[in-house]
Regions:
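Active-site-adjacent loops and short helices of periplasmic peptidoglycan-processing enzymes
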Residues: 1-109, 115-123
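Domain-terminus/edge residues, biased toward the C-terminal soluble/receptor-binding domains
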Residues: 89, 100-105, 109-322
Length: 322
């Protein structure tokens, strides 16, 4: 979550990636894995991000939190607010670095949700997670290798983040991107919590990723900005309303079960202009047999302006007869 908020601050220009941040006494004295920065330094945001991600530097994490929010306490408030906004219902933060604290909790599902949103919302910063080695100039050469062993074992793996405390065990949120026949590029995430060692978490993560690619098919239902449905529109300058999604609609299903998929459009009727581009009008339910897998809003792909007086009057009569 610390990385998510830092990337959000960069995106919204609250901080700049080349900007230097001071290292407080609090950051300098952080226990656990560190980047080995000290209060005599002013460190660029870009290097602090690398220290946080590659070296799991608790000192870098606190320096970033203070740089974004002014204080660790305020940053933790932002973390919890964002967790609620993202739908991480079983997560509560007590600090930005992830060290054990009473009430500091999360789940595998919430971490998967956070990782998905981070990669979707901030794709320009995802390459940070694939960096294998990093050391800030003037600091010791210790702790300069990424602890995500899959980066060194599997060329398709490009992240994401390790974690370890005595209470939580060895944890890893891993991401992989592979080119598959007749499918194209497909990304999967895995979450392993509570493993007994670095090697164990890497092995279990590898098993999960391989299983995900072999046991499930990715089925593209519609392309981005493709009209899913074109219902008639009343009192408008155009006869139909094009509804779809700005993202490709892709669903993962057990291998060989794609033929069971079906879609159901839920929308108001009649549809009376005007309609603005991007306006939500109904939804698309994706079903597998009688089971609803998920539901996405249908958005207006092309605006429909209101017709002139005569056109509206004519459609009013037709609606009344209907």
């Amino acid at each position: 979550m610390t990385a998510y908020l830092v990337f959000d601050a960069l995106k919204n220009r609250k901080i700049d990636i080349k900007q230097t941040l001071p290292v407080s006494e609090r950051a300098w004295k952080m226990p656990g894995s560190r980047m080995f920065i000290d209060p005599k330094m002013k460190v660029p945001v870009e290097d602090l991000i690398k220290g946080m991600i590659v070296q799991s530097g608790n000192d870098a994490t606190v320096a970033l939190a203070e740089g974004v929010a002014g204080s660790v306490e305020r940053f933790v408030q932002l973390m919890n607010d964002q967790a609620v906004f993202l739908g991480m219902h079983n997560t509560h933060y007590k600090n930005p670095e992830g060290l054990t604290a009473p009430g500091h909790t999360t789940t595998a599902r919430d971490l998967a949700l956070l990782a998905t949103r981070l990669m979707r919302d901030f794709p320009d910063y995802v390459p940070f997670y694939a960096i294998k080695k990093y050391r800030y100039e003037g600091t010791p050469a210790a702790n300069d290798t990424n602890r995500n062993l899959l980066l060194f074992r599997d060329a398709s793996v490009d992240g994401l983040k390790t974690g370890h405390t005595q209470a939580a065990g060895y944890c890893l949120v891993a991401s992989a991107k592979r080119e598959l026949p007749n499918v194209g590029t497909r990304r999967l995430l895995s979450v392993v919590l509570g493993a007994e060692s670095e090697n164990a978490r890497a092995n279990e993560s590898q098993k999960l990723l391989n299983w995900g690619y072999s046991a499930f098919d990715a089925v593209k239902l519609f392309d981005a900005n493709q009209a899913v449905v074109t219902p008639p529109v009343w009192k408008g300058k155009q006869p139909v309303l094009k509804l779809g999604s700005v993202r490709p609609l892709v669903v993962a299903v057990p291998a060989g079960s794609a033929a069971q998929l079906k879609t159901q459009v839920v929308r108001p009727d009649p549809l009376v202009a005007p309609f603005a581009k991007g306006q939500a009008v109904g939804s698309l339910k994706v079903m597998q047999g009688d089971k609803a897998l998920f539901e996405v809003p249908l958005l207006v792909l092309e605006p429909v302006e209101q017709a002139g007086v005569l056109g509206r009057a004519w459609d009013a009569v037709r609606l009344w007869i209907k």
